[in-house]
Structure formats: C-alpha cells, structure tokens
Regions:
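Conserved small/polar residues in nucleotide/adenosyl-binding loops
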Residues: 3-11, 240-247
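ATP-dependent carboxylate activation and anion-phosphoryl transfer catalytic cores
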Residues: 10, 20-23, 27-242
Length: 247
C-alpha cells in the first residue's frame, strides 16, 4: 500500500474486486488511511485481491451502448456533476454531456467501439470514463445492462433493451434501422437526480463517495439546463425556499 501511494503521490482509490454498488470502496489520502481501509475490507474474507488505483480529478462520463459484434450504437453520452469518486448511482447525470469538447466525445465514442469489439460484445455494454482536460481514461467496463439504461432510453427515444435483445438473437444494428456510432444529441437537457432516504435511517453517514447510497432517482427534462435541474430537484423533493437560503 505504501508503494502504491509513493508511486501515485496523490489520493488513491482502495477497493475490493468484484463488488456491486461500490461496496467497500474508499478514497485514501495517505498511507495510514490506506492501511485503515484495507483492514476494514479484510474484516470480510476476500476471494479476490484488493486493488489500489490512482485517483484522478476530472469529469466523469458514462455511456450505454449496443454492439452487434461489428458495429456499435451509442444513444448518447452522460456527464456526472459530482466530483470523480462519487458512485455513478449517487451522481446527478446530465444528457447530453455539456461541458466537454467535441474531441472528448469523439474519443469516448471510439474507445467504446474498440472496447466492445475487443470484448466480443453482442448486446449491451456500459462504460464509465474520466476526462482530464482532453485526455480520456476508462474507469470500468461492464458488458451488461446498467441502472442508466432506462434513463438514456427514455431521453433519447432509442429502445436499447429491445435492440440488444434483437442483436443477441442475430440481427445487426443496420438491419434494425439504425446508423452505427454516436447518435445526434437531443435539443433539450435531461437530468437524472438521485433520491436518498437518509431522513429514514438515523445515524447514516450522509457524505457521498465510491459506495452507493441512493435508493431511487427521478428525471427533469427541459430546454435549458437550469430549468431541467429545477425540475429534477422538484422531483426529488430537494427544493429550498428563499427564506431558507437567506438563513
């Protein structure tokens, strides 16, 4: 662990392998924290190694795509508002990604295509990325459906579950009437807002990190970012009055 922190010089992500929802993951800033978090993980017998990854500060982005073994269909790119290291299920997600360059979007589309082909995916694939400036890094690749599939399907109008099912039984993306690649962005903003149940769980740690804590989500759609965000907050019952803001 000390060697890892020396190599990376900054924060690292300490995590067990093969977990869902970011269970047991922690961001460590020094050797003492690394040792503490590894001891916590080791309280439960581990069949797989504990991983120590470099922590990058950047913009987190995500795609759900369908691959037929040759071509890939990417309905859109989602951008997370929260800092990197916050679990994707706890992040506010914005479609289309609105603060990254065309180069970053094209790089994400190309990486998605190459990874799906290299993994021989026929069906759904979910990939999470970090953009640090114009550099794009892969966080993780999941050759399966993800919790963002209903969201991206609804806001783009592309039935990716239906398409993936057809692809699995032998159809191609072109045969299903779609052009491969990253699809044209919508002219509206769609924001997915996580919903938490902290008020029902006394003593729960409410700070956000790699381990997922949300229990639901809602959606705000509008022509502008501010209006979509307002609707999403309204759906999550997280609105504040002007009096509360003054306090």
């Amino acid at each position: 662990s000390s060697a890892a922190s020396d190599v990376y010089k900054r924060q690292v992500l300490v995590r067990p392998s093969y977990v869902l929802g970011g269970q047991g993951m922690q961001i460590a800033s020094c050797d003492e924290e690394i040792e503490e978090f590894m001891a916590i993980i080791n309280r439960i017998a581990q069949d797989h190694p504990i991983l120590v990854d470099k922590y990058l500060q950047g913009k987190e982005l995500e795609v759900d795509a369908v691959c037929d073994g040759t071509d890939i269909l990417i309905p859109g790119i989602m951008e997370h508002i929260e800092r990197t290291g916050v679990h994707s299920g706890d992040s506010i997600s914005v479609y289309p990604a609105h603060t990254v360059s065309k180069h970053v979007k094209e790089t994400i589309a190309e990486y998605t295509r190459r990874l799906a082909k290299a993994l021989h995916v026929k069906g759904l694939i979910n990939i999470q990325f970090i953009a640090v400036g114009e550099e794009v890094y892969v966080i993780e690749v999941n050759p399966r459906s993800s919790r963002t599939v209903p969201y991206i399907s609804k806001v783009t109008g592309i039935p990716i579950v239906d398409l993936a099912t057809e692809v699995i039984i032998g159809k191609t993306i072109k045969e299903l009437g779609y052009e491969p690649g990253l699809q044209k962005e919508a002219e509206y903003i769609a924001i997915k807002m996580p919903v938490f149940s902290f008020e029902k769980i006394r003593g729960a740690e409410i700070s956000l990190g790699p381990e997922m804590k949300s229990t639901g989500e809602c959606l705000g759609i509008a022509k502008t970012f501010n209006e979509a965000l307002y609707k999403a907050f309204l759906g999550a019952c997280l609105l504040y009055t002007s009096d509360a803001a003054d306090d």
